[in-house]
Structure formats: structure tokens, C-alpha cells
């Protein structure tokens, strides 16, 4: 009988605990009798008696004029602070800042930083079905439409009824660019808030922790931005690993060159892989100018391999220093081979390298 009573009590406690609402879990446990207490007064000392020295060790500081005075008792939420999470490479936050904001540094030079951030934010809003009330790219400001979330609140555990709660929020995003254009600050502000339970409005903007709401939406935007970067990196990695076709043509200076059927940003790392595979040691490079300074060492093959087969990646080149010039040609990329004096290879000499370059460039499983 005792065992049955214990099990029954445990089940009842579990049911009651499970039915506690989010609001109940965010307030302190225990009673709130202290809210009814009145401030004490100093001991009244008669005028003809020496006044003792009272300790001020436990005196509470006075509130500022604009400090909130209604967050006491059940109205005071006991929750962990909302923190902005800088998940994106090149992002960071100001420690101790009271604002919901995040800093982004330029990492990808394929497009302006502000364009990248706005595109990611617009993509997030579209994915979540959130409308836009206004967007001014020149003023770097966007205001969302109402973000509506619905939740069914269960009544008491012994009741079969439920209440529908709607929360509606509107946010403003501001983007501040540094003069050099390579650092931006994205700010989130809660513009308006309404909460309804059934037909009654139970909370408005003044009743909620605005910063918690702002940090929550900002973290979701940052998470979406970081996800987009990971997807783009994975796609780019697949494109780099995938074989590329080359032909012989001319570069922008009418010099004989290999023409790669890929854009510059994808072809550049692919060229580095191909050169390494063919026995070139890259001494220095400048991607912004498309220059590679290399030394040809020949391919490294073991003694056993040399006995049974010829090195199919060997090139008819002296083991010395060379240069490569990589140029953006729209949907294609030109690769010009130069000697150490920056003189382009002739078409005949370039043709002697074509078969090996074309085969390795077309390899679908080149190691990265």
C-alpha cells in the first residue's frame, strides 16, 4: 500500500511539474512576502545623547531617476542573460554591451560587405515568411512586418481546456559601415510587441525584456548567415574538386594562354592544386593581381614506380623558376605561363605542356 501511494504521489508531482508554464519557470521560487515590507528607519536617538556611528556596509544604493521600479516579486524574471553569438567567421561582439549588435569583418571579397549582410538578412526573412514593412538600402535600414507566433497554452492539469497565445513583434535592423567599407555593425531593435491570450492583450512592449527579444532575432539571423556560408563553402569545394576543361587561346594581353572553363575565384585554388600535383613549388603569390611565383622541381615518384612505369605527369621544363599569370575572363579564366623574366611562353612551347595540364586539370578527384 505504501509503495502504491509513493508511486501515485510521484506521478502527480511529475504531472504538476510538467504543466508549469514558461513564465512560472522564469520567476523565483518561494513566497514574495518581502514585497509587502516597508523600509526601516534609523534608530531615533534623543537629542541629549551622543549619536553612535552607524555602519553603512549594507546600505542599498539609491536608484537612478530612469531605473525601472516595477520589476519586483513575480514581475522579476530570473533568467540567464541574453548573449549575442558571433558564429560567422570574422564576426565579434563588444563585451558588456547593452545593445543587440554584432560586428562583421570583410572575409569574402566577391561582393561588398553590406550587400552580403543584407542579402543574408533578406534570405532569412523570406525563409521564415516574415514580411518587410520598409527597406532603405541607402540609409541601411530595414523594418520588418509583424512577426507572429502562436502557442497553445494548456490550462490546469485537471482541465481539458486550453488557451491560444499570440505574440506579435516588429523589429528594425540598422547597418553601420566603417569608412573603409570592410567592417559593419548590424543592430537589432524591438519596435513593437503585443501578446494576446484569447481576446485579451496581456503584454505590450513596456512589459517585456526588449533586449532578450532583440538578441534572439539577431542570433537567428547570424545563424542563418553562418549556415549560408557553410553551404557556399561546401558548394565551392565541390566545384574545386570537380575537373575543369582547358583549351589554348589568348589572355587579355594577346599572349598564348590556357583558357579554363571556370570563374576566377574557383579556378584560382584549382590552379594551385594542379601546380602542386605537377611538381611546382609555389614560392609566392598575389591573388589580387593574379600572379604566381613558382619553381619547377619535377614530380616526386618512388624508385619502384620509376622501374615499372614512366612518369605521366612529367613536363618538358628545366628545373628552375617560372611565373604564372591568372586573369579573370568572365565565366572563364586565362592561365599564362611565363619564364623568370615574365616573358610568355610561345604557342608551340605552351602546346608541349597542354596534354599534361589538361589531364590533371580534368581530374575529378584531385586531393585538396
Swiss-Prot record:
InterPro entries: BamC, BamC_C, NlpB/DapX. GO terms for biological process: Gram-negative-bacterium-type cell outer membrane assembly; protein insertion into membrane. Residues 1-18 form the signal peptide. A lipid is attached at residue 19 (S-diacylglycerol cysteine). It is found in: Cell outer membrane. Part of the Bam complex. This is Outer membrane protein assembly factor BamC. It comes from Pseudoalteromonas atlantica (strain T6c / ATCC BAA-1087). The gene is bamC.
Amino acid at each position: 500500500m505504501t509503495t502504491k501511494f509513493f508511486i501515485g504521489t510521484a506521478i502527480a508531482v511529475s504531472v504538476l511539474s510538467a504543466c508549469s508554464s514558461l513564465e512560472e519557470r522564469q520567476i523565483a521560487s518561494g513566497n514574495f512576502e518581502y514585497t509587502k515590507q516597508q523600509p526601516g528607519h534609523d534608530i531615533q536617538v534623543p537629542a541629549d545623547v551622543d549619536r553612535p556611528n552607524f555602519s553603512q556596509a549594507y546600505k542599498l544604493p539609491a536608484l537612478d531617476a530612469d531605473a525601472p521600479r516595477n520589476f519586483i516579486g513575480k514581475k522579476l524574471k530570473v533568467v540567464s542573460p541574453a548573449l549575442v553569438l558571433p558564429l560567422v567567421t570574422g564576426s565579434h561582439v563588444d563585451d558588456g554591451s547593452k545593445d543587440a549588435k554584432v560586428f562583421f569583418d570583410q572575409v569574402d571579397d566577391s561582393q561588398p560587405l553590406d550587400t552580403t549582410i543584407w542579402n543574408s538578412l533578406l534570405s532569412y526573412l523570406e525563409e521564415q515568411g516574415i514580411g518587410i514593412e520598409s527597406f532603405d538600402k541607402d540609409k541601411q535600414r530595414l523594418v520588418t512586418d509583424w512577426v507572429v507566433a502562436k502557442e497553445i497554452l494548456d490550462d490546469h492539469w485537471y482541465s481539458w481546456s486550453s488557451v491560444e497565445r499570440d505574440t506579435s513583434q516588429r523589429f528594425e535592423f540598422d547597418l553601420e559601415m566603417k569608412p573603409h567599407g570592410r567592417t559593419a555593425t548590424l543592430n537589432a531593435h524591438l519596435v513593437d510587441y503585443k501578446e494576446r491570450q484569447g481576446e485579451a492583450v496581456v503584454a505590450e512592449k513596456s512589459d517585456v525584456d526588449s533586449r532578450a527579444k532583440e538578441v534572439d532575432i539577431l542570433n537567428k539571423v547570424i545563424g542563418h548567415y553562418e549556415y549560408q556560408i557553410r553551404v557556399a563553402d561546401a558548394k565551392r569545394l565541390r566545384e574545386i574538386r570537380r575537373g575543369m576543361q582547358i583549351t589554348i587561346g589568348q589572355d587579355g594581353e594577346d599572349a598564348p594562354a590556357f583558357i579554363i572553363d571556370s570563374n576566377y575565384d574557383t579556378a584560382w585554388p584549382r590552379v594551385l592544386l594542379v601546380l602542386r600535383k605537377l611538381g611546382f613549388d609555389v614560392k609566392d603569390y598575389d591573388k589580387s593581381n593574379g600572379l604566381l611565383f613558382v619553381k619547377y622541381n619535377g614530380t616526386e615518384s618512388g624508385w619502384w614506380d620509376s622501374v615499372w612505369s614512366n612518369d605521366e605527369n612529367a613536363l618538358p621544363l628545366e628545373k628552375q623558376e617560372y611565373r604564372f599569370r591568372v586573369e579573370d575572363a568572365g565565366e572563364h579564366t586565362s592561365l599564362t605561363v611565363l619564364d623568370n623574366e615574365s616573358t610568355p611562353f610561345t604557342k608551340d612551347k605552351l602546346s608541349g605542356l597542354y596534354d599534361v595540364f589538361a589531364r590533371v586539370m580534368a581530374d575529378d578527384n584531385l586531393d585538396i
